Amino acid sequence: MAQRDAVPSLPPKFKLKGNNMTDEQNPSAWAVSTPQRFTDIEFADDYTRNDLHEYVLYPQMCGNIILEGGYGCGKSTIAAIIAKERLGTTASVYEINGDAWADDTLIKLRSIFNLARVCKEIPIVIINEVDRLKDKQFKLRDFLDEHNQRLLVIMTTNHLGNIDGSLKDRSDVFRVRGFEPQLAVRVAQRVLQRYGLAVADNDLLQLFERNLIGDETELSLRQIGRAVDKLVLQVGKRQPSNPSKPLLTVV
């Protein structure tokens, strides 16, 4: 049977350590490795990691953050985990996509703010793709002015140039970069090693360099994840090792 074009052929150096499993037994290795804590998140540079980590270390910090970067570089994941580590699953966190902003959104935001004050918590508002607010951005600006330094607002965007200058002036902007092929190798190896797959760094580097399109120099986490899943599916997979249960012998 002919091999599907979507799955790259692997050089002979790729080896499997562990037991082969069928595709049906093989969920996405990348999805299983989704970050659960801030320290699990992959960053392309330590400056951004350290600056954003302060919002976790000091939960009393307020203000407005804009996370800008290319598609699939982890902006929404960063925002969600900052909120989770500061507030857990309380009702003081409100998340919305920019294109879902409705006439009653400000009413909901004020309700969240008032509830958080009763609970003596600093509320967090996450607005994904804030540039898609378009002409409604001034309503968000007025809300930020109304509650200045009394909540944390985390906004994400793929297009910083589409955000009104007054919002950018009121916010700290952090560039969430993609990963150059050398850094992508490090990210991929952490997941592959969990599944007992031995892949040479140079082979991974060549694979990621081939995934760059045109004059691109960086890969998104989604691109790295798809490559990892293809490798796990093709080469084989074993579950992360757990202590085996003792065998009982009846005599």
Q: Positions of the model-derived regions?
A:
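Short glycine-rich substrate-engagement loop in P-loop NTPases that contacts/grips substrate
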Residues: 46-50, 91-123
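Conserved catalytic/switch belt of AAA+ P-loop NTPases
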Residues: 114-115, 127, 131-169
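Pre-Walker A (pre-P-loop) alpha-helix and adjacent loop at the N terminus of AAA/AAA+ ATPase modules
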Residues: 24-68, 112-115
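Short conserved motifs of the RecA-like P-loop NTPase core
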Residues: 198-215
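Conserved AAA+ ATPase "SRH/arginine-finger" region at the nucleotide-binding site
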Residues: 98-99, 172-185
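The conserved phosphate-sensing helix
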Residues: 213-232
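Walker A/P-loop
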Residues: 56-95
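Conserved C-terminal helix/linker of AAA+ ATPases
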Residues: 232-251
